[in-house]
Amino acid sequence: RVVILHYGVGRVGGFWFDQTIFFRDLMDKMDKDVAFVILVCDDVNGDRAKEILKPYSREKLPDGTSRVKFLTVNAKTSRFYPWARDPYMILTDNNGNLIFLDAGYNETPFPITNFHAIFANAKSQVGSIHRGGGNIRTTNEEMIIGMDTLLGLKIFPRWIQYENVESLYSLAKDVDRENLPAFKARFDAYCNFIHKVLAPDKMMIIPGKKDFFERLEMENFPFTRKTVWNTGAQPAYHTDVYLGLGHIDESGKRVVFIADSKSGVEIAEKISPEERRQIEQNLPALLETEGLTAAGVPLTKEQISERFQWEKHKLLDLCIEKSYTIAEKLDKAAEHLENLGYHVVRIPYLPNGLDNRGRNDAAIGIGFNYSNVLTEVYGGIRKVYLPEFGFRQLDEAAAQAYRDAGFQTVTINGLIMPGFTTGNAHAGLDCLTSEIRFPVRWAKKYYDRD
């Protein structure tokens, strides 16, 4: 078992957080036979991260190699993408060698071409699969893929030069009822190709597809995006924001965890407005302990409180309001998967209400998201690593939902800052990690040296 992490500057609106806080907590709390591959940049910040994490690199795996291995990438830390889930997907060839399929991110240094320095015989391939790994969830049996990944596929001009480059999303805007069957057939053809490229041996599931085409037929799907980003064709901007994967239950069904904003509202509305203000008042102190900075300068809880003014905005009240607007999409995704035979477990969720609407322009809130987490399922082990946001009733309800599903809960520090967002929810632990759950072989140098 291997966890890949990116040491970049996690930044939102000029505010930065120190990723080594959650790196260290994750390594302390995960089993000692879990290996970590940490991508760092060739600059002073990368050197600093390696120095902080040096004690963990001295730990040994059962195979005798270092538990933590660093891979240097050609980029500056300030420009390095910290969300390890998104930029590539990990496949294997017929010989079991790793393939890192780049997901079309244009930022430096992608595609990353030196994974072979860590993993024996690893290959890099450049793909054009829109939206990245965070929008695709896989198990040994299935691949669950978000609609935006498919709607974002480019329709390139063939031999006629004056044809415009479009996406399936832009084509769908002009589809009328008469031409809908033809467009659906075209959409399915592209889906079949992606299925073959990514995981031909797995069942492909697209939770938002049925709802999208039903709304398209009724001509009430709102095409409001210039790019395929948060189009409304899926419950959240990435599948892993609202959907997590569990084990096979006693009846043979795959357990899936789906965010539930209705239950989040029920919990939030049970407490008094005064209690909600107290929770908002306590958030800056938690962010201070997580190392929140403004352009690298550490902030005090008083400065954080003055900048964000969550009490004044009544953040939790806005979160309650926002919950009602997205509940139906989440419920439909849960219903769709349940109808396919999955064992659906709903996890309380309170989306950020300080979104990018005009009256909240440039404001940053927090999405109380417990679905974007890291689960471990192997042998008899059932563990979930999740955040605590300081909203005690919601924190406890989310943890209890996982415990009721048979999982041991492990809280990880350093995850409130990744919850910062101007949208419904931001990234979490699943976004920050890319894991390999099958045997790998290290590059020869590790066995020679260690």
Regions found by a protein language model. Give the residues of each.
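The feature marks the mature, well-folded catalytic cores of soluble enzymes
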Residues: 1-450
